């Protein structure tokens, strides 16, 4: 086999393509399908391809007229199968888009496919949704294996668990019964046990072991962040005071440290420990997660506190009650300890490494006598959200240079797939199956 020919559906900004690029696979993109005009611009900028390669609305594509390809990648819109999307499944037109993916497999019969979707798909409609999908893959001639993979185990500080399905055309591999671990009681094992009873065509893919999370959210935060990403201190003052009387944990977990809503409730007001993981980022109107950062007296710098929630795509502009998921608490050294809002020569904060004013008996410039560290709350930046999905900084810069707004950049990362997870899948698929098939 020469270059691996790839067709991409529901392409977004091209996480599959970024993964193939990163592991050095020589591939040819024969086409992609994306209806969001901003995602198309980002995709073309990041992967240096012409918009003419975009086939547009997948439901309007004549599948028989598509060019030949070896690998089909993509994940149909997941909102109809997720809790956040009210789980309407195939009753939602977004759910029926799955069958456009299957029709493409049926008409073009590529050798391999990789499909991604939300964890909730497994037990949606009491498992019937997964049953229908697996049967559809079998009916069009593919043996499959599936696994739940969490981004936090793939060098990314984001707790993002997604379902991945690998398919190989049945004439290329013998049928293998799944090696089920009956000691595992998770929903995936239960789902696979159901599929065994349906006589699904299967094989055993060697998935990367998910051992331990290694990165903290603070490891990917930008050093210098524009003031526009910070929340109004009037809205965060009560939480800041509360945090100042406690010590944040260093556990590699998703830890909510507080809520900035007046009621103290609502996911949109949650603030998370940046020494841990991010929760899953999503497409929640294009805004960034809020996190907490502790000021270190020893270094004089903001000390970020571990894994991010799943990325969401919320609006970057001023946070309303629906736009507060992705913000960060950061500490800034103030010029005066007793009044954070007081200014000295028109400035509010001292620069990093700048010497303190001379201490005298009149003023106590920069001297925090008996006081706790200062915290601030801000949203994650679009670049930080790109990093949470394991895209290169250069990928972000290309999309930004293409004129994509912050709001759209947030949405695009929330809609995307973690690149390092896909890298692990492609490494095994290429090493064990694609290279072997070409011998």
From Swiss-Prot:
Function text: Modification confers resistance against restriction enzymes that recognize these sequences.
Keywords, in A-Z order: DNA-binding, Host-virus interaction, Inhibition of host innate immune response by virus, Methyltransferase, Restriction-modification system evasion by virus, S-adenosyl-L-methionine, Transferase, Viral immunoevasion
Similarity comment: family membership: Belongs to the class I-like SAM-binding methyltransferase superfamily. C5-methyltransferase family.
Catalytic activity entry: a 2'-deoxycytidine in DNA + S-adenosyl-L-methionine = a 5-methyl-2'-deoxycytidine in DNA + S-adenosyl-L-homocysteine + H(+)
Recorded superkingdom: Viruses
Enzyme Commission numbers on file: 2.1.1.37
Pfam families reported for this sequence: DNA_methylase
Record protein name field: Orphan methyltransferase M.SPRI
Source species of the chain: Bacillus phage SPR
Known partners and oligomeric status: Monomer.
InterPro entries: C5-MTase (IPR050750), C5_DNA_meth_AS (IPR018117), C5_MeTfrase (IPR001525), C5_meth_CS (IPR031303), SAM-dependent_MTases_sf (IPR029063)
């Amino acid at each position: 086999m020469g270059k691996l020919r790839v067709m991409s559906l529901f392409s977004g900004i091209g996480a599959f393509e970024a993964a193939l690029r990163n592991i050095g696979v020589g591939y040819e993109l024969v086409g992609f399908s994306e209806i969001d005009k901003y995602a198309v611009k980002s995709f073309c900028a990041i992967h240096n391809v012409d918009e003419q390669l975009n086939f547009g609305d997948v439901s309007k594509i004549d599948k028989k007229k598509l060019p030949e390809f070896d690998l089909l990648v993509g994940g149909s819109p997941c909102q109809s199968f997720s809790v956040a999307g009210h789980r309407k499944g195939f009753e939602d037109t977004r759910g029926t888009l799955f069958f456009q993916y299957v029709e493409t497999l049926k008409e073009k019969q590529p050798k391999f496919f990789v499909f991604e979707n939300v964890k909730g798909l497994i037990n949606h409609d009491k498992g019937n949704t997964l049953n229908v999908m697996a049967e559809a893959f079998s009916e069009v001639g593919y043996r499959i294996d599936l696994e739940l993979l969490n981004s936090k185990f793939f060098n990314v500080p984001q707790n993002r668990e997604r379902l991945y399905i690998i398919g190989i055309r049945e004439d290329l591999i013998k049928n293998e019964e799944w090696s089920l671990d009956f000691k595992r009681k998770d929903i995936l094992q239960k789902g696979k046990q159901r599929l065994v009873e349906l006589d699904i065509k299967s094989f055993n893919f060697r998935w990367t072991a998910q051992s331990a999370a290694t990165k903290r959210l603070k490891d990917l935060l930008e050093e210098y962040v524009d003031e526009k990403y910070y929340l109004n201190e009037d809205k965060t003052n009560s939480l800041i005071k509360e945090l100042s009387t406690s010590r944040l944990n260093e556990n590699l977990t998703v830890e909510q440290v507080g809520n900035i809503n007046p009621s103290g409730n609502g996911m949109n007001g949650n603030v998370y420990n940046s020494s841990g993981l991010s929760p899953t980022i999503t497409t929640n109107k294009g805004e960034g997660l809020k996190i907490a950062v502790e000021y270190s007296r020893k270094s004089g710098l903001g000390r970020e506190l571990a894994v991010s929630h799943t990325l969401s795509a919320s609006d970057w502009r001023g946070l309303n009650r629906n736009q507060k998921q992705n913000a960060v608490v950061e500490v800034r050294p103030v010029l005066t300890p007793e009044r954070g809002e007081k200014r000295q020569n028109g400035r509010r904060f001292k620069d990093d490494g700048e010497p303190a004013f001379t201490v005298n008996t009149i003023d106590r410039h920069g001297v925090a006598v008996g006081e706790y560290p200062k915290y601030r709350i801000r949203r994650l930046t679009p670049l930080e959200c790109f990093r949470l999905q394991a895209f290169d900084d250069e990928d972000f810069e290309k999309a930004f240079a293409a004129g994509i707004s912050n709001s759209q950049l947030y949405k695009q990362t929330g809609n995307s797939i973690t690149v390092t997870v896909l890298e692990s899948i492609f490494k095994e698929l290429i090493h064990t199956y694609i290279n072997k098939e070409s011998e």
